[in-house]
Amino acid sequence: MTDIRFHGVKPTRATKHSAGYDLRSQLDIVIPAGATVGIDTGTLAIFPPHLCAMVCSRSGLALRGLAVANAPGIIDADYSDTIKVLLHNRTKGDWVIEAGDRIAQLVFVPFVVGGDIPADERTGGLGSTGD
């Protein structure tokens, strides 16, 4: 069993066979037509360094025009802040998100790296490991 823990707002899986954990908005927000906004989920994930977490669109929302802008968003094991979801409204109207709405899915996957690793720790913030 892989040790994955959550702090803050704990995401849930819909069924025992669901690959993704549902991430929820922590605030009411309006996303204007054509705009992209960052929404804090209040969720902090702690997981082993051989995994990364992918923030993926919810299929039902994507079908209606709301999707994760950088899908999949990649979260490294050394990211130490709450998860933010960058949502893009592809519709011609404003999109209302209410606190508690499911806005994305979080899926954990193993990965392989090769060669030299240049740094031991992260120096950048959201979306950055530096330069």
For every predicted segment, state its role.
Residues 1-131:
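DUTPase catalytic domain/fold
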